[in-house]
């Protein structure tokens, strides 16, 4: 018989109250749920009178099986109990299901309440649902545009570019997903504009009083506390630091004034002025005569100063960029656009519903909306439905309660017995990781903080962890004590969230020490770019592989709970879990090279697979053969097997024009290659003709048949999965056309959107090898699972914050929808506030995701990361933990860039038995010190001796592993040091060009110009802002790029052009004083530019190009003479003269006037290679005219220099 803890016993037996069970990881919540159901049945409650809601269908199946097993076990004791026998039969038909399945049951039973045809079908294919939604969107677009609706046009213009309307469409589709999880989506939508209503006084508005003011007071209070902590240091009063203290006293008073003006509701512009006055006096320089203690405190004061200035800049940028009048204007304009969005969204929902009704379909969002309508619509029929379920269910048990959304919460409320406490909710807010499904952890937290304070509710905390060893439990607690707090995550982890060790069945001599393995990314030479926003380091995978091999070689022992014995480690005991699956393909490749078995439980990233890239390129080619990259990719693929030398022959014969032109020309050559080209073009033309008269799905299948593609990929490694992937694309094309869509280009665009949204189509292929293989999965997929050894990988990945800087933010709080009005180029106060809130919500969920990952380990936890400049990061982490409180300050947490920013501060602190915690790099030779390894984070005293005895052998093993890894010579090493694609900005670095115009230009503008109107007053903490030479050079290029040669030929014209660039948001107003207007005016008035004035239509600026270049021409010592690199770049300018093209490039390099001739020659040598590259590109782009002259425009020297 199971011995339950006191808290578990309460959760099983307590009744008469609404009960919330907060069940930490590994606390046996499923066992408790099953036992509670059994107790209900044994007390005479039929299982049919219970509603048990689970999060997944698999969980529902498991729940049913476990309940049936419990009843069967009881029947062994009471074989004559007929009631139990009837209950055993009833379990399969009992209401144990997901919320969607329950809602579907409501609809099938009471469809007539909402006038729904009972013969409806469920739209289970997500892709088909997306297609139908897309069709609804296109139809409302057409209705609006045909009606010449200017408000709608303004909305689309605000969020979309010149070429498409994807920005506005994405907004409407995302808003749909949020609105339809609300119990009253129309009310939710109608409330969206209200947060913009501020009248003529910001300070008196609800927005300011209820949202912005409390946030700012809290932030400034935190800054004040940091200042006060420094001023409380005894050493700050020393004679060495008198001026430092004076500086901080003055700053502290200014910060107090800002806080006081906020707190007392002074006018907005006065609050803004007080913020702008928050500055430090002149910097104090450090003296060598100071004591060591003074120097240490001085350095702390400098670090704090930088941090304070940084935080104040962010506050200014978010809430005080312009004065009150301008802020109100932005809010009013935004409000108008939001009202238009609301109207369009309602039409989209109505149109989508209409299309589904016409086909008698309902989708998953309909299930919950329809069920809620049936249960709450104010008609006699609705009351019948609601009363039916209220009478039917004596108790409602909800698993994973932390992941319910607002609509689901209201459905549950609607069926709860009136006036009775019949809710039993189990969950763990620390494991709420489904924000992308509109999960609402705040619903759990609301009950968590109120239940138990009256006689109608009860809160039970299950903290005992029966999964993990004491060391794993201690590691998790140590790491999360500083992270999860009441103001970050909503729970005080130290007081109420810690795991309590409960797995006393583990033997005491098991090897269980937690480990973390860091690689210094800066020193690694092979890296993959992943879709999560960072690089996935080769060495990170290699070190995981090395550690697995080491564990196997050491005959590492695991505890088998089934046999209650120790046994040697098997591969199936190991799980590698990651934040995303984007690196799966690379991990699989490395494991295959290492001959280690690996089973990927998640679907691969479908759109990254070789076969999908190949077929999509062929479809692009059929749609438009005048595309070089798809054309060459298809020709080089296994379908046609054109080799590099053959492609080179084709290009040499026709060096001008695109590659399709060259291919067509070569097809007439009487040779084996010419015949090959001709056959390729014939098949392409056949398929293009076929595409014009047949369905897309038929075209895809025709490609498979003509090229034998299915047979080809089946013969490759993992061939069956590749075949499934291709067949899946065919099925999606069929679904696409069934939904009423047509056109190959549109289908390609649709698939591209799915790729960008990472909506994988393929399903994982089950494998016989899964039984004894290392498991690779995402943290989301690992939830609810456990493994003896867990590697948590990719902890150095940068968080993806792109959505936070977008044109809109959607949330389910009071702000709802917040947008950026593009004509102002500043974020409205509402948008700035929403971004702050959204960032914290996102990072809170990332912290919870991390918690889920770390708590999967039973016996051993290994954390793995590749980190840039690891030593600098370690210094930063040391300063980010408040050691007295064991807390990472909130401001540090909401600025976290990666999981390591959460974990690092605690990992870097001294531990109780620090003498056993060593950098294992100390055992390595200097050349091998790529890896920073720390083991045994939580060693207990009795294990110190054993660990010291083993350390020499472990260090020797690590040394050997690292040497083997880095003595390996990759046969294509040269190719790993570059890519098949290079931008000119990268190549210019090889030519030592100090100005990366093509790349830096857009980055400079986007980061510095957040609004069109110039700020009249510069905040004092921004005064004296310095611009680099590259930034100034970029701005000079920008002026010349847009200069109008059709205007007046004078200095005033130049000033007007610069002012217009500032007004348009293309040039930072703070940059203008740094421009050399004399140099700019010299050039536009020079003899060289005189033809520009005469024929401005012949002048081409910022011309983009792509060119295939020999790699050996770009990179020294490149061993493969046949290797090619596709170069993409932008030419500053060229002029179409009568006899040919005049190519020119601006340079802002400093020219030494004392030795001008030699300095110019040096600059000329530096950039000759670059201009030759531009010359080659222009010659390939132009059939009629070739480059007849190349010139460097040296703005500093006021010289036009010809280049050979």
UniProtKB/Swiss-Prot annotation:
<dbReference type="InterPro" id="IPR000212">
    <property type="entry name" value="DNA_helicase_UvrD/REP"/>
</dbReference>
<keyword id="KW-0238">DNA-binding</keyword>
<keyword id="KW-0067">ATP-binding</keyword>
<dbReference type="Pfam" id="PF13361">
    <property type="entry name" value="UvrD_C"/>
</dbReference>
<feature type="domain" description="UvrD-like helicase ATP-binding">
    <location>
        <begin position="2"/>
        <end position="469"/>
    </location>
</feature>
<keyword id="KW-0347">Helicase</keyword>
<keyword id="KW-0227">DNA damage</keyword>
<dbReference type="InterPro" id="IPR027417">
    <property type="entry name" value="P-loop_NTPase"/>
</dbReference>
<dbReference type="InterPro" id="IPR011604">
    <property type="entry name" value="PDDEXK-like_dom_sf"/>
</dbReference>
<dbReference type="InterPro" id="IPR014017">
    <property type="entry name" value="DNA_helicase_UvrD-like_C"/>
</dbReference>
<comment type="similarity">
    <text>Belongs to the helicase family. AddA subfamily.</text>
</comment>
<dbReference type="GO" id="GO:0033202">
    <property type="term" value="C:DNA helicase complex"/>
</dbReference>
<dbReference type="InterPro" id="IPR014016">
    <property type="entry name" value="UvrD-like_ATP-bd"/>
</dbReference>
<feature type="domain" description="UvrD-like helicase C-terminal">
    <location>
        <begin position="497"/>
        <end position="784"/>
    </location>
</feature>
<keyword id="KW-0269">Exonuclease</keyword>
<dbReference type="Pfam" id="PF00580">
    <property type="entry name" value="UvrD-helicase"/>
</dbReference>
<keyword id="KW-0413">Isomerase</keyword>
<keyword id="KW-0547">Nucleotide-binding</keyword>
<comment type="function">
    <text>The heterodimer acts as both an ATP-dependent DNA helicase and an ATP-dependent, dual-direction single-stranded exonuclease. Recognizes the chi site generating a DNA molecule suitable for the initiation of homologous recombination. The AddA nuclease domain is required for chi fragment generation; this subunit has the helicase and 3' -&gt; 5' nuclease activities.</text>
</comment>
<dbReference type="GO" id="GO:0043138">
    <property type="term" value="F:3'-5' DNA helicase activity"/>
</dbReference>
<dbReference type="GO" id="GO:0008408">
    <property type="term" value="F:3'-5' exonuclease activity"/>
</dbReference>
<keyword id="KW-0378">Hydrolase</keyword>
<feature type="binding site">
    <location>
        <begin position="23"/>
        <end position="30"/>
    </location>
    <ligand>
        <name>ATP</name>
    </ligand>
</feature>
<dbReference type="GO" id="GO:0000724">
    <property type="term" value="P:double-strand break repair via homologous recombination"/>
</dbReference>
<dbReference type="GO" id="GO:0003690">
    <property type="term" value="F:double-stranded DNA binding"/>
</dbReference>
<dbReference type="GO" id="GO:0005524">
    <property type="term" value="F:ATP binding"/>
</dbReference>
<dbReference type="GO" id="GO:0016887">
    <property type="term" value="F:ATP hydrolysis activity"/>
</dbReference>
<dbReference type="InterPro" id="IPR011335">
    <property type="entry name" value="Restrct_endonuc-II-like"/>
</dbReference>
<protein>
    <recommendedName>
        <fullName>ATP-dependent helicase/nuclease subunit A</fullName>
        <ecNumber>3.1.-.-</ecNumber>
        <ecNumber>5.6.2.4</ecNumber>
    </recommendedName>
</protein>
<comment type="subunit">
    <text>Heterodimer of AddA and AddB/RexB.</text>
</comment>
<dbReference type="GO" id="GO:0005829">
    <property type="term" value="C:cytosol"/>
</dbReference>
<keyword id="KW-0540">Nuclease</keyword>
<dbReference type="InterPro" id="IPR014152">
    <property type="entry name" value="AddA"/>
</dbReference>
<keyword id="KW-0234">DNA repair</keyword>
């Amino acid at each position: 018989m199971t011995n339950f803890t006191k808290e578990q016993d309460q959760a099983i037996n307590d009744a008469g109250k609404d009960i919330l069970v907060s069940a930490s990881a590994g606390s046996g919540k499923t066992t408790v749920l099953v036992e509670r159901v059994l107790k209900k049945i044994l007390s005479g409650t039929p299982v049919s009178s219970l509603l048990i809601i689970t999060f997944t269908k698999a969980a529902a199946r498991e729940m049913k099986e476990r309940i049936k097993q419990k009843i069967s076990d009881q029947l062994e004791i009471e074989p004559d109990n007929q009631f139990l026998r009837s209950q055993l039969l009833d379990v399969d038909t009992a209401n144990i299901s997901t919320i969607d399945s329950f809602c579907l049951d409501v609809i099938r039973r009471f469809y007539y309440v909402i006038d729904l045809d009972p013969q409806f079908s469920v739209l289970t294919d997500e892709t088909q649902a997306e297609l139908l939604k897309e069709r609804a969107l296109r139809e409302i677009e057409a209705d609006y545009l045909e009606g010449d609706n200017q408000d709608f046009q303004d909305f689309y213009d605000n969020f979309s570019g010149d070429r498409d309307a994807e920005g506005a469409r994405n907004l409407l589709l995302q808003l749909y997903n949020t609105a339809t999880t609300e119990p009253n989506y129309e009310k939710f939508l109608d409330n969206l504009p209200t947060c913009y209503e501020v009248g003529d006084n910001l300070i008196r508005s609800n927005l300011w009083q209820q949202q912005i003011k409390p946030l700012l007071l809290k932030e400034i209070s935190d800054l004040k506390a940091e200042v006060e902590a420094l001023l409380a240091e005894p050493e700050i009063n020393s004679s060495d630091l008198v001026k430092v203290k004076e500086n901080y006293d003055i700053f502290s008073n200014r910060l107090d004034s800002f806080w006081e003006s906020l707190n007392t509701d002074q006018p907005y512009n006065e609050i803004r002025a007080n913020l702008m006055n928050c500055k430090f006096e002149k910097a104090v320089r450090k003296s060598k005569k100071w004591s060591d203690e003074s120097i240490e405190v001085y350095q702390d004061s400098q670090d704090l100063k930088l941090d304070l200035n940084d935080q104040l800049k962010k506050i200014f940028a978010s809430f005080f960029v312009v004065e009150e009048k301008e802020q109100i204007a932005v809010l009013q304009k935004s409000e108008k656009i939001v009202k238009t969005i609301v109207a369009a969204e309602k039409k989209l929902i109505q149109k989508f519903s209409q299309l589904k009704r016409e086909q008698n379909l309902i989708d998953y969002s309909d299930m919950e909306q329809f069920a809620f309508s049936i249960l709450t619509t104010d008609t006699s029929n609705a009351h019948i439905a609601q009363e039916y379920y209220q009478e039917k269910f004596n108790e409602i048990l909800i698993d994973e309660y932390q992941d319910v959304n607002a609509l689901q919460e209201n459905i549950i409320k609607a069926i709860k017995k009136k006036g009775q406490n019949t809710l039993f909710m189990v969950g763990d807010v620390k494991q709420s990781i489904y924000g992308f499904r509109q999960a609402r952890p705040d619903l759990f937290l609301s009950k968590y903080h109120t239940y138990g304070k009256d006689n109608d509710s009860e809160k039970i905390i299950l903290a005992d962890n029966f999964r993990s060893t004491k060391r794993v439990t201690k590691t998790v607690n140590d790491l999360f004590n500083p992270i999860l707090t009441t103001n970050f995550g909503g729970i005080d982890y130290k007081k109420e969230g810690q795991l309590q060790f409960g797995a006393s069945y583990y033997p005491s001599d098991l090897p269980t020490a937690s480990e973390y393995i860091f690689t210094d990314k800066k020193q690694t030479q092979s890296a993959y770019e992943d879709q999560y926003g960072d690089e996935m380091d080769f060495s990170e995978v290699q070190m995981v592989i090395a550690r697995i091999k080491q564990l196997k070689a050491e005959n590492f022992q695991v505890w088998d709970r089934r046999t209650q014995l120790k046994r040697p480690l098997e591969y199936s005991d190991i799980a590698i879990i990651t934040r995303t699956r984007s690196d799966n393909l690379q991990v699989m490749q490395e494991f295959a090279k290492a001959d280690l078995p690996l089973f990927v439980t998640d679907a691969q990233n479908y759109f990254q697979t070789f076969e999908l890239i190949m077929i999509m390129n062929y479809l692009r080619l059929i749609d438009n053969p005048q595309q070089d990259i798809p054309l060459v990719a298809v020709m080089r693929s296994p379908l046609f097997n054109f080799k590099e030398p053959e492609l080179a022959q084709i290009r040499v014969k026709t060096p001008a024009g695109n590659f399709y032109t060259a291919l067509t020309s070569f097809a007439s050559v009487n040779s084996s290659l010419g015949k090959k080209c001709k056959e390729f073009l014939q098949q392409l033309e056949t398929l293009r003709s076929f595409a014009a008269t047949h369905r897309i799905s038929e075209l895809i299948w025709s490609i498979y048949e003509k090229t034998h593609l299915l047979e080809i990929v089946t013969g490759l490694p993992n061939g069956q999965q590749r075949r499934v992937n291709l067949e899946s694309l065919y099925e999606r094309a069929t679904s696409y056309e069934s939904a009423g869509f047509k056109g190959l280009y549109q289908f390609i665009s649709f698939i591209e959107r799915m790729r960008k949204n990472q909506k994988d189509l393929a399903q994982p292929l089950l494998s016989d090898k899964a039984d004894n293989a290392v498991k690779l999965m995402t943290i989301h997929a690992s939830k609810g699972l456990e493994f003896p050894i867990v590697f948590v990988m990719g902890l150095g990945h940068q968080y993806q914050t792109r959505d936070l800087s977008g044109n809109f933010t959607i949330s389910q709080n009071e702000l709802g929808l917040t947008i950026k009005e593009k004509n102002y180029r500043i974020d409205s106060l509402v948008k700035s506030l929403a971004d702050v809130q959204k960032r914290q919500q996102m990072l809170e969920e990332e912290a919870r995701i991390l918690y889920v990952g770390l708590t999967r380990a039973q016996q051993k936890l290994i954390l793995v990361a590749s980190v840039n400049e690891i030593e600098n990061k370690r210094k930063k982490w040391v300063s980010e933990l408040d050691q007295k409180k064991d807390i990472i300050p909130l401001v540090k947490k909401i600025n976290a860039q990666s999981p390591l920013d959460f974990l690092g501060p605690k990992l870097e602190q001294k531990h109780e038995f620090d003498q056993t915690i060593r950098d294992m790099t100390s055992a390595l030779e200097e050349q091998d010190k790529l890896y920073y390894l720390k083991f045994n984070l939580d060693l207990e005293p009795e294990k110190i001796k054993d660990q010291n005895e083993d350390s020499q052998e472990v260090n020797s093993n690590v040394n050997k592993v690292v040497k083997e890894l880095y003595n390996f010579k990759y046969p294509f090493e040269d190719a790993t040091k570059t890519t098949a694609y290079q931008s000119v900005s990268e190549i210019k670095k090889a030519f030592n060009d100090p100005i990366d115009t093509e790349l830096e230009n857009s980055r400079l503008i986007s980061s510095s110009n957040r609004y069109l109107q110039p700020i009249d007053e510069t905040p004092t903490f921004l005064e004296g802002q310095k611009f680099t030479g590259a930034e100034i050079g970029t701005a000079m290029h920008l002026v010349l790029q847009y200069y109008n040669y059709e205007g007046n030929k004078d200095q005033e014209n130049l000033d007007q052009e610069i002012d217009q660039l500032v007004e348009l948001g293309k040039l930072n107003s703070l940059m203008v004083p740094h421009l050399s207007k004399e140099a700019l005016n010299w050039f536009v008035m020079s003899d060289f530019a005189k033809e520009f004035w005469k024929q401005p239509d012949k002048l081409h600026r910022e011309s983009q190009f792509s060119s295939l270049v020999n790699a050996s021409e770009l990179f020294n010592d490149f061993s493969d003479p046949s290797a090619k690199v596709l170069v993409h770049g932008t030419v500053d300018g060229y002029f179409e003269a009568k006899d040919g093209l005049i190519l020119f490039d601006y340079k802002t390099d400093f020219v030494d006037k004392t030795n001008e001739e030699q300095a110019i020659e040096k600059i000329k040598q530096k950039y000759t290679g670059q201009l030759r590259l531009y010359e080659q590109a222009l010659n390939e782009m132009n059939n009629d005219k070739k480059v007849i002259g190349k010139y460097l425009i040296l703005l500093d020297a006021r010289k036009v220099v010809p280049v050979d």
